[in-house]
C-alpha cells in the first residue's frame, strides 16, 4: 500500500467532516468570525434549513482585498501567531472558510472601512474564482449555497428543514446571550423569525437579552451569581429549584464568552441542585466563567464545544459554592410558575349546574337547592328569601360527611405583625395535609409533609457533618484491586473520606484495603463503592459520590421521620412550622424536588373574580 500526500481540497473536505456536521455549524463558524471582527450588527438569512442557502452579513472591520485569498486558505488566520495557549478569540484555527468552500458554493464579499470598494471571491468545491471588485457596505458578507453538494451522502443524515432551522435558531440564541451589545436577526427568504435588538453591555443589559430569549418568566425565577476564586470569576443566573425543565437544553455555559456544551460543567450544575431538585429534572441556568486563557484548553474538540480546565476541582467548587450561597440567600421565594400553574387550574366559567355531587346521602328534599342555584334569578331576593335559604342550607351542610375535605381553622385573628412574616399566619388546615396561610398581599398553601421533610433533612445534615461520621469496622478488611494511577489518585482523598466514615489505606501498588465503612450505609458493596470513587477522583478530582450516598440515606430518614399527611395540626403548630420554614435554607422544595409551598397573590385572586 503506497502512502500518498493528499491534495489540499481532500484535506479541506476531511476537515469539513469534523467541523461542519450540519448547517448550524456553518452559521456558528461564520457568526463567530463576525464577532471576532468587531461587528455590532449580524444578520443571518437561510433557506431550506440552511441546506440550500445561508447568508451571514456583518458590519465588522472587513478583510483587506489583498488578503481575501489567504482568508479561504487552510490554517491562515489573523487571530494567533505562535501561542496556542493564550487565545482571546472565538475562532483561531483558520479552518472554517476553506472547509465550507470544499463542500459547498462559497461567496465571500468584504470591504474595510477605509476601502472605496468591496472585493469578492468565489469558491466552488475547492475551485477559486477571483478576487474581483464588488459593491457592498463596509463589513463582510458570506453566502453559502448547496451545502454538501460535493458529498451528497451527507445530505441523507440531515434532518427536516424545520429541525435544521430550529438548530440554527438555538445556535444563534446561545451565542447572542453572551454578546448583548450585538444586534442579531435570523430570517428566511420571505420572513424574519428572530430579531434581537442590541442592549447595554452590562448586567442589566445581559438580563434584558436573556429575557428576550428565555421569556419573561426567567427574571422573576432566577438568582444573580457573582463569585470569584483566585483568578477565576463566575457570573450569571441560576434558577429557583422549582423552576426547572425535563432536559438540559436550557442550561447555558460560557467560558470566556465562548458557548460550550461540556459534560463536566453540566454535571457540576446538576450536582449543585442535587439536594433541592428531582433527579429527572434539570435546572435552568446561565453561567459565565472568565479565567486566564492559559488556564483552559479550548482546542480539544473539532467544534470547540468541549473544553479542558487546568484545575477542574477549583471550577467545580466555585460553581457549587456560588449556587449554594445564592439558594441560601433567597430565603422564602416560590417560583412564579407554580402560582401560574395554580391559576390556570381554576375554571371560572364553569356553570354551577355542571358540578355533580359525590355524596350519595342527599335527601330528595334538598335537590331543589342545586337547581335553584343554577337557574337565573327572575326577581330580587328579599330578607325572607335569605332566611329561608339559610334554614334549608344548614341541615344540608350537616349531612355532608367528606373526611378528605376536613378543615381545621385557627380561631384567632392574626395580628398585623404575623401578616408581615414571609409565609404569614396560619388560617386553616385542609385535607389534613395543606396549611392555608395569609400574608398582607397573598395566600400561601403549604404541604406540611413536604415542608417538614425538608426541615428534618437539613437538621440531619447539620448534625451529621458537624463532626466526623461514625464508622463500622469490617470484620475482615476488604482489598480492592485498581490501576496504580487510580489507587494513587484515590489515596490523595484519604482524609476527606475518613470524615465520612470510610477508612482506606494503600495495600501495595494498585491495591487499596478498606478497613471501615460509614455506619449509616449499613451493608455496602465495598468493591463497587471504591471503584466508583476512584473513577470520580480520576476524572473530576473529587469524591462526592460517597457524600451523595449518605445524603440519600439522610433523605430517606427525613421522609419517614417527618409529619405525615393526615395529621391534624393546631394553629400554634402550623405557625411554628411556618417560622421554621422561613429560618431554614432550601425549604422551597422537599428532598424529592417538589414544591413545599405555593403563593397566590391577592391581585391574582381578584383577577379570578373579575375585580381587576
From Swiss-Prot:
One GO cellular component this record assigns the protein to is: mismatch repair complex
GO terms, molecular function: ATP binding; ATP hydrolysis activity; ATP-dependent DNA damage sensor activity; mismatched DNA binding
DNA damage among keywords: yes
Instruction: Name one matching Pfam family.
Output: HATPase_c_3
- GO process terms (BP): mismatch repair
List the keywords (alphabetical). DNA damage, DNA repair
Indicate yes or no for the key word DNA-binding.
no
Entry coiled-coil feature ranges? none
Q: What does this protein do?
A: This protein is involved in the repair of mismatches in DNA. It is required for dam-dependent methyl-directed DNA mismatch repair. May act as a 'molecular matchmaker', a protein that promotes the formation of a stable complex between two or more DNA-binding proteins in an ATP-dependent manner without itself being part of a final effector complex.
Q: What PANTHER family does the record tag this protein with?
A: DNA MISMATCH REPAIR PROTEIN MLH, PMS, MUTL, DNA MISMATCH REPAIR PROTEIN MLH1
What family does the database annotate? Belongs to the DNA mismatch repair MutL/HexB family.
Protein known as = DNA mismatch repair protein MutL
> Which species does this protein come from?
Bartonella quintana (strain Toulouse) (Rochalimaea quintana)
**From which lineage does this chain's organism come?**
Bacteria, Pseudomonadati, Pseudomonadota, Alphaproteobacteria, Hyphomicrobiales
Gene name for this UniProt entry: mutL
